[in-house]
């Protein structure tokens, strides 16, 4: 019969040291968070659900055939993305239905899903209009 220590040792050998696994997971989360915040700074627009969701969208007609989702964030990450976008001068647009739909169906670093092309295009038109006529902004 195996002792408690033998069982622990066997588990470590099979699954890896829990402390190392925790550290690796933490580092991965930091890398993801840093990447999402950096993507928010490069975005054309950040679509939000006021405080809980943020989706960074990039579109330059001469560079990309369709808008791309650069990154998605929820909770604290979404707040950091919004802060970074504002600091970088990226428009932050509140659109609850679109933010929820993008969060549910779009993948980071992919083109937007075909069913969301029209709503995203409308947001991009509004951003372009605001950029062309800054004195009309609230």
Task: Please annotate each region the language model reported.
Residues 1-82, 88, 92-104, 108-138:
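N-terminal cationic and glycine-rich segments that engage phosphates or anionic surfaces
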């Amino acid at each position: 019969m195996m002792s408690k220590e033998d069982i622990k040792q066997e588990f470590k050998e099979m699954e890896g040291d829990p402390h190392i696994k925790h550290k690796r997971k933490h580092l991965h989360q930091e890398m993801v968070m840093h990447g999402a915040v950096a993507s928010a700074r490069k975005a054309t627009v950040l679509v939000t659900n006021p405080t809980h969701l943020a989706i960074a969208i990039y579109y330059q007609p001469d560079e990309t055939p369709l808008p791309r989702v650069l990154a998605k964030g929820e909770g604290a990450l979404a707040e950091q993305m919004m802060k970074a976008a504002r600091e970088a001068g990226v428009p932050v647009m509140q659109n609850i239905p679109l933010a929820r739909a993008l969060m549910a169906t779009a993948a980071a670093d992919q083109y937007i899903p075909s069913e969301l092309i029209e709503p995203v295009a409308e947001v991009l038109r509004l951003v372009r209009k605001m950029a062309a006529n800054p004195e009309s902004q609230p």
